[in-house]
Amino acid sequence: MENVLQGRPALLLVDFQQGFEEKEYYGGERNNPQAEQNAQKLLAYWRANELPFFHIQYSSVSPKSPLFPEKAGYAFKEELKPLPGEPVLVRSVNSAFINTDLQAQLDAQGINTVVVIGLSTEHCVSTTTRMAGNLGYYTFVISDATAAFNKTGVNGERFDAELVHQVTLSTLQDEFATVLTTQQLLQQLRVPVAGS
């Protein structure tokens, strides 16, 4: 079944944190350098139209991680930082649904559709998307507002970030979510939304 935008979709901004600038820690090169710019467009649309959104923040338990709470990298990227009063959900695992009240907040507002963007495609974006799909939400991932990093396989083979990104998205498409670009999503949002 193809997902359709329903009601008031919630935007989940996953881990747009400064620590991801330390690319070597995450495997080296990253794809989609325009991901943050596209995320800004989407956040601006959600703010302007008073649609629900949540800033999701990763709090690493490892002092070595750039996302450890006492490091500068824990902070949100300047261009995507929450404004006063905007909801921020903090957790220490990959899924935005674990050890947060995200599901309760979505359900309390009658939200059945989520749009996932953020870092990184292969970890927290993928895990959050899979769980959203399993929980029964109509789920969308925005391919050019997410990004992946180079990876080393179990056999030592190196996989570049774009390949990691595309393979991850292909495992999500149709099974857990519908994958769209920023432009495709905005085009759909600018027509009457089903159920509104």
What positions do the PLM features span?
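Von Willebrand factor
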Residues: W46-V61
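Active-site-adjacent betaalpha module
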Residues: M1-A10, Q37-K41, A48-N49, P66-S196
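Short glycine-enriched, charge-decorated loop/helix-capping segments at active-site entrances
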Residues: Y25-N32, K64-L67, G156-R158
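Short acidic, Gly/Ser-rich segments with clustered Asp/Glu that frequently serve as metal-coordination loops
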Residues: Q17-K23
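N-terminal nucleotide-binding beta1-loop-alpha1 segment
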Residues: L11-F16
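Active-site loop signature of alpha/beta-hydrolase-fold enzymes
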Residues: G19, V61, A148
